[in-house]
Amino acid sequence: MGVGRSARGRGGAASGVLLALAAALLAAGSASEYDYVSFQSDIGSYQSGRFYTKPPQCVDIPVDLRLCHNVGYKKMVLPNLLEHETMAEVKQQASSWVPLLNKNCHMGTQVFLCSLFAPVCLDRPIYPCRWLCEAVRDSCEPVMQFFGFYWPEMLKCDKFPEGDVCIAMTPPNTTEASKPQGTTVCPPCDNELKSEAIIEHLCASEFALRMKIKEVKKENGDKKIVPKKKKPLKLGPIKKKELKRLVLFLKNGADCPCHQLDNLSHNFLIMGRKVKSQYLLTAIHKWDKKNKEFKNFMKRMKNHECPTFQSVFK
């Protein structure tokens, strides 16, 4: 990540000299030396003069802020650049982006998101470059659409600077455009079998079911999944009377592989969300009680409280 002057192109190289963020931090000095009066004034000019009840402060990025705890710097400013004033609010809103980050849809996803959710402590706010936003959006929105989401209004790219100092990426080879790092597998089926990752998917989904699948069909560019048996773990928007005739759809999944569906003899953990009148599959795992990570997930699920973030993608 670097701080530079924005370039209009999306290829990855910002015009002018890219400064290493570490150097910028060293130049800024210790947390106690930040000019918070100037910082507050600048934030106000960027965010329509919103009044904050707390003055800006430099705080540690907590380990449980999973989106940004390993982003490459250790401290962030509150309020952040998305108008979140408390760490609890930051965690709540940022948690919904962790599953997308795990899809590796663009190499700049974490830098872009964390420049807003957990902005680095400098003497004035620095926003991500518009071209970085556009590059991440163009690579990640197709993945988001598998889950029934679109690029949210709060991250609309024309809000960010294109002719001013801004946060940029410095790729290993800046002559090449960033490429999505994901596989051709349907994104909801490309899941890591780790208890933490399954919990994250559970929290990002509206409902969860233990399911035996009767058949899988192609329909209007989607995969249509017809259950044989199902047991609700988390009903969310599903009404009990709808449960009997429930069918699921793997959005845009007609032609991408979902290896879990190659063998329907197993029970599955199915997670999803309702979009309009459809119930979309957002994650699928083989129901395997012999697997250590799956067993750990089942134990944690009983007492785990998920944050609420329904408003994030509006």
From Swiss-Prot:
It comes from Mus musculus (Mouse). The FZ domain is involved in binding with Wnt ligands. This is Secreted frizzled-related protein 1. The lineage of its organism: Eukaryota, Metazoa, Chordata, Craniata, Vertebrata. Soluble frizzled-related proteins (sFRPS) function as modulators of Wnt signaling through direct interaction with Wnts. They have a role in regulating cell growth and differentiation in specific cell types. SFRP1 decreases intracellular beta-catenin levels. Has antiproliferative effects on vascular cells, in vitro and in vivo, and can induce, in vivo, an angiogenic response. In vascular cell cycle, delays the G1 phase and entry into the S phase. In kidney development, inhibits tubule formation and bud growth in metanephroi. Inhibits WNT1/WNT4-mediated TCF-dependent transcription. The keyword Secreted applies. Residues 53-169 form the FZ domain. GO terms for cellular component: cell surface; cytosol; extracellular space; plasma membrane. The keyword Signal applies. Interacts with WNT8, WNT1, WNT2, WNT4 and FRZD6. Interacts with MYOC. It is found in: Secreted. One of its GO terms (biological process) is negative regulation of fibroblast apoptotic process. Residues 1-31 form the signal peptide. One of its GO terms (molecular function) is Wnt-protein binding. Glycans are attached at residue 173. Belongs to the secreted frizzled-related protein (sFRP) family. Keywords: Developmental protein, Differentiation, Disulfide bond, Glycoprotein, Secreted, Signal, Wnt signaling pathway.
